């Protein structure tokens, strides 16, 4: 069992779907039957209903009991004691470290989606850590949200989207990709961000004309937030650069991504170009503050060791005071 993942869900939340997806063997300590049913229901909804599950209660005691079945077949489990789940997922751990999910894997409908190559670069520029809190503002189909959730396996991703159709697509894509640390926030930024935890990384795919307000809101929550934006127009790119200059943020990195894909035409192949996209990224810094002469807290007094100071380095007043 040295290759099994050990997870305790007793009194805390864990992104169990991601753990199951990444490992062939998972031991999970759970609190009660209701929590077990919730886990089995979510596994079934996320396409893992046929994964083998063993539920052990009162282990090592005379009344020890172990039930074995698939997640789907055990949906109505009724035991009430503290239990251990042992989950065997034969396809666990087969996903690449960097997701790079093909475009046709996502359910799209009529909602715009960040394409695969641009998405991979944007995710890399976000510099997401495993326990990161990530915002995807204007999430669309949730393609960025899903890949971010695959990287931040111990964190949480918040997909902010106002359109009902897109909200349902995000939920569907989260289920298809087995990520349960992705949360759909219904509404428009910046108002929809108010109750969310402070972000480590923010991707902005759409701002509905409120770009500056969104940037102000996320920087207020975390002055050191990492930001990545996708833009089609020069005007949007210039807006971002103007904002970084006016707010004394480090200079933004701007790259243009122009992707062409081979397309078969008869017996030949020709390159079919996609629209070029600007990928803009920067790490926020707190705005510099002018010292207020009326506020003592704006000034720092430096302690001086007088034994290390030569008299000729001092002003006359200080020398006079010391030598008295």
Give, region by region, the residue ranges found by the protein language model.
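Class I SAM-dependent methyltransferase SAM-binding "motif I" and its flanking Rossmann-like core
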Residues: 1-22, 190, 248-272, 276-278
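A contiguous loop/helix-start segment that scaffolds small-molecule binding in enzyme catalytic cores
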Residues: 25-110
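Core SAM-dependent methyltransferase catalytic element
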Residues: 85-87, 267-294
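Conserved class I S-adenosyl-L-methionine
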Residues: 131-140
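Conserved SAM-binding loop of SAM-dependent methyltransferases across substrates and taxa
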Residues: 141-153
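Conserved SAM-binding motif I beta-strand of class I
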Residues: 156-161
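S-adenosyl-L-methionine
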Residues: 162-199
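Conserved beta-strand signature within the Rossmann-like core of class I S-adenosyl-L-methionine
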Residues: 224-232
């Amino acid at each position: 069992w040295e290759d099994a993942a050990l997870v305790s869900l007793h009194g805390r939340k864990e992104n169990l779907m991601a753990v199951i997806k990444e490992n062939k063997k998972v031991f999970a300590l759970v609190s009660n039957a209701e929590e077990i049913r919730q886990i089995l229901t979510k596994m079934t909804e996320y396409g893992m209903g046929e994964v083998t599950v063993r539920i052990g209660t009162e282990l090592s005691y005379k009344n020890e009991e172990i039930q074995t079945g698939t997640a789907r077949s055990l949906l109505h489990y009724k035991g009430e004691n503290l239990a251990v789940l042992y989950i065997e997922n034969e396809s666990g751990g087969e996903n690449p470290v960097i997701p790079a999910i093909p475009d046709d894997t996502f359910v799209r409908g009529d909602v715009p989606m960040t394409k695969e190559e641009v998405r991979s670069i944007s995710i890399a520029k976000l510099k997401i850590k495993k326990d990161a809190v990530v915002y995807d503002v204007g999430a669309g189909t949730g393609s960025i949200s899903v890949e971010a959730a695959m990287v931040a396996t111990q964190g949480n991703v918040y997909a902010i989207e106002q359109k009902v159709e897109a909200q349902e697509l995000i939920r569907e894509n989260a289920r298809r990709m087995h990520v349960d640390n992705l949360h759909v926030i219904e509404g428009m930024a910046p108002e929809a961000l108010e109750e969310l935890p402070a972000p480590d990384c923010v991707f902005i795919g759409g701002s509905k004309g409120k770009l500056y307000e969104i940037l102000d809101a996320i920087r207020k929550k975390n002055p050191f937030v990492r930001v990545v934006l996708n833009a089609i127009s020069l005007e949007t790119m210039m807006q971002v650069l103007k904002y970084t200059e006016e707010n004394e943020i480090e200079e933004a990195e701007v790259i243009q991504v122009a992707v062409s894909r081979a397309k078969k035409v008869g017996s030949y192949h020709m390159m079919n170009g996609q629209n070029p996209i600007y990928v803009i990224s920067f790490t926020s810094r707190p705005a510099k503050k002018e010292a207020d002469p009326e506020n003592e807290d704006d000034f720092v007094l430096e302690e001086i060791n007088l034994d290390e100071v030569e008299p000729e380095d001092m002003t006359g007043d200080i020398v006079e005071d010391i030598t008295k």
